[in-house]
Amino acid sequence: MGLAKRIIPCLDVDNGRVVKGVQFVDIRDAGDPVEVAKRYNEQGADEITFLDITASSDDRETTVHMVEAIASQVFIPLTVGGGIRTCEDIRRMLNAGADKVGINTAAVFNPEFVREAAQRFGSQCIVVAIDAKKVSAEGEPDKWEIFTHGGRKPTGLDAVEWAKKMVEYGAGEILLTSMDRDGTKNGFDLGVTRAISEAVHVPVIASGGVGNLDHLVDGVIEGKADAVLAASIFHFGEYSIQEAKQRMTDAGIEMRL
Amino acid sequence: MSDMKKSTVAVIDYGMGNLHSVAKALEHVADENTSILVTSDPAVIDAADRVLLPGVGAIRDCIGEMHNAGLVPSIRKAMAEKPFLAICVGIQSLMSHSEENGGVDCLNHFQGNALFFGEKHTDHDGSKLKVPHMGWNQVKHTINHPLWANIPDNARFYFVHSFYVVPENKSEVAGTCDYGLEFCVALARDNVFAVQFHPEKSHKDGLQLYKNFLNWDGKP
């Protein structure tokens, strides 16, 4: 009896529609974000992450309205990420009904922003998103580096050290995405998940690579993740949230059923 | 239409933002005769039939803003006479003192302190536990109370906090949770009820608790 591990479906939203994800070239439409969020809420999702991948900033207003619509109908925690660069962006999303915001690239370019945001809004609502890629060669000790721009630009920052630094600056949670695995359906990068989860005292959400329900189990048991995030396995009806929770429960993981 | 049957719920806004989800959840369960008013106006709080004290952010700012906005007399008045519900940092603000922010004196409605889990918090078997305590945990009812109506014992609620309350008077504990240690997550005395978790983020059981609050006559 204790705290349950969480399953978090992620909605990658482009121009007001849920799409399959940034890493996919053939973007598939997965529906209206509000309807999708409601469906996951009914299926027993523990939280929902809304990731705004719209390229143009003109559509931010649309995002605000969607967050409002989701937050009025879905009574579970909602994290909003994508394009969060200033405290004003955070304030707008929280006022629209988001419970947490995800800060990614802005943290890399200006770590002080994380500190400022945590002091102003509280660590509980600051999720730092980390996109990591393995950079060590075969036979070398494992090493992962932070990448930006959808995994195209290296930063020279060591992923584990960066996670520790972000927590020191006030991150209340880490959303860790393996850029090697994202979109592959080959499972999480369990090495980096475990390395970061063991290095920090805040919860770590594993992301990137989920292709089946055993991957979710592995993320918690081997990767030591506190929560697992997935998108496409849920969007197209391959698996429901209930099925995922049942598989995890059967594997001995404490879940909210 | 007569105002006689109208009931109002004041959600206290002390400038810390994000009361949207609390208000939306209350609206979701309220009937057509109940108005939910998010307010920082002491007169509105004084006139309301029931009062909800949310909690957002760190305790020093919370208590500071309550004082700055001149809300403390209205909060005390409401706690003395009508159904009153405090959530999350709200429960901590009702204690005597909190360890957060280097130590902050709080409203002292419930005697006792808010303590930090610590960055090296461990489970009963010695394994590492993350802080904040974030996610869905089971709430055990330690008393029967109208606010627990139609909520199963050990139902899961959503938590996100690093500090927990330790009341001096154990008979005021209404619910507990286990996270490395068993701690108090709900307090009750007379017309005041306070919870550490977020009912507005706790799906159907959370909405049920809000519904119970709207139906509560303030008697234990």
From Swiss-Prot, chain A:
Its predominant location is cytoplasm
Q: Where in the cell is it found?
A: Cytoplasm
Q: Which reaction does it catalyse?
A: 5-[(5-phospho-1-deoxy-D-ribulos-1-ylimino)methylamino]-1-(5-phospho-beta-D-ribosyl)imidazole-4-carboxamide + L-glutamine = D-erythro-1-(imidazol-4-yl)glycerol 3-phosphate + 5-amino-1-(5-phospho-beta-D-ribosyl)imidazole-4-carboxamide + L-glutamate + H(+)
Q: What is this protein called?
A: Imidazole glycerol phosphate synthase subunit HisF
E.C. numbers = 4.3.2.10
**Which keywords belong to this entry?**
Amino-acid biosynthesis, Cytoplasm, Histidine biosynthesis, Lyase
Q: What is the lineage of its organism?
A: Bacteria, Pseudomonadati, Pseudomonadota, Gammaproteobacteria, Oceanospirillales
Q: Which family does it belong to?
A: Belongs to the HisA/HisF family.
What assembly does the database describe for this protein? Heterodimer of HisH and HisF.
The processes (GO biological process) annotated in the record are: L-histidine biosynthetic process
**Gene Ontology cellular component list:** cytoplasm
Q: Which GO terms describe its molecular function?
A: imidazoleglycerol-phosphate synthase activity; lyase activity
Function of the protein: IGPS catalyzes the conversion of PRFAR and glutamine to IGP, AICAR and glutamate. The HisF subunit catalyzes the cyclization activity that produces IGP and AICAR from PRFAR using the ammonia provided by the HisH subunit.
- The catalytic site is made up of 12, 131
InterPro entries per UniProt: Aldolase_TIM (IPR013785), His_biosynth (IPR006062), HisF (IPR004651), IGPS_HisA/HisF (IPR050064), RibuloseP-bd_barrel (IPR011060)
Instruction: Identify the pathway.
Output: Amino-acid biosynthesis; L-histidine biosynthesis; L-histidine from 5-phospho-alpha-D-ribose 1-diphosphate: step 5/9
Output the NCBIfam families linked to this UniProt entry.
hisF
